[in-house]
Amino acid sequence: MSSADFNFGDFTTTYTSPTIPAYPDTLGQLQPIQPNPQAAYPPVSQHHASHHVQHPHQPGYVLSNPPQLSGNKRKASDAMSVPPTPGARVMSFEEASRLAAEEDKRKRNTAASARFRIKKKQREQALEKSAKEMSEKVTQLEGRIQALETENKWLKGLVTEKHGSKEDILKLLREFSAHAAKVSKDAAAAAADKAEAAADKADAERAREESSFCVSTSSPSSDESVDTDNKKRRKD
């Protein structure tokens, strides 16, 4: 099937419109916007090209003075490519263990300081509570002392009103002290008598024991004399 079957025209010819003017084809004579890269930049030498094989760049852009980063990167890559020695692995393990020990020590110190702060706070609270209780007890005792002093004054007043002046009270006090001294003296004498009687009794018991001991030691000799007499009589 071809275009002739559908009665289509020939599209290879240029279409010309009577209303649109024709423009000349001068696009091939236009100058390029960017100049020739080979003319703008110097050619790359073989020495620089060998250094920049691993770093491709856009065509026509060559650095006249390459930076020093390439050498540093190469050294870093070489250092990373070298496998670590066993000593380095041991040092790294020791370093890791040391860091772990320091971290554990730091945590334990933190926990200990927290416990110390808690105990200190509890101790301070207990001391404050005990101080408050002691102050309350002191206040109560002071009130009791004042009440006792008031009662003592009241009793003194009653005694002076009943027995007269202070001289009578002093006389009664002297009599009471004399009676108390006499009672204590009698008690001391009775105690001395009891002690002397107990000592005499102990001496008597000791003498009795000594006499019984002497009798028991002398009895075997008399028995022996009796036995010897009986033996002599039998021989005769």
From Swiss-Prot:
Query: In what ranges is there compositional bias, type Polar residues?
Result: 28-37
PROSITE patterns per the UniProt record, alphabetical = BZIP, BZIP_BASIC
Q: In the record, what terms sit under GO molecular function?
A: DNA binding; DNA-binding transcription factor activity
What mutagenesis or variant effect is reported for K105Q? Loss of DNA-binding
Fetch the CDD domains from UniProt. Answer: bZIP_Zip1
Annotated region (Disordered) at: 26-89, 189-236
**Stretches with biased composition (Basic and acidic residues):** 193-211
Query: In which broad location class does this protein mainly occur, judging by the first location in its UniProt entry?
Result: nucleus
- Protein name (Swiss-Prot/TrEMBL): Regulatory protein cys-3
Which stretches make up the bZIP domain?
A: 99-162
The record's similarity note reads:
Belongs to the bZIP family. GCN4 subfamily.
Give the start-end ranges of region Basic motif.
Answer: 105-137
- Residue stretches of biased makeup (Low complexity): 212-223
Induction section of the entry: By sulfur deprivation.
**A GO CC term?**
nucleus
Q: InterPro entries recorded for this chain?
A: bZIP, bZIP_sf
**Main function:** Turns on the expression of structural genes which encode sulfur-catabolic enzymes. Binds to sequence elements upstream of these genes.
Q: Which species?
A: Neurospora crassa (strain ATCC 24698 / 74-OR23-1A / CBS 708.71 / DSM 1257 / FGSC 987)
> Where do the record's region annotations for Leucine-zipper lie?
141-155
User: What is said about its interaction partners and assembly?
Assistant: Binds DNA as a dimer.
Q: Which subcellular locations apply to this protein?
A: Nucleus
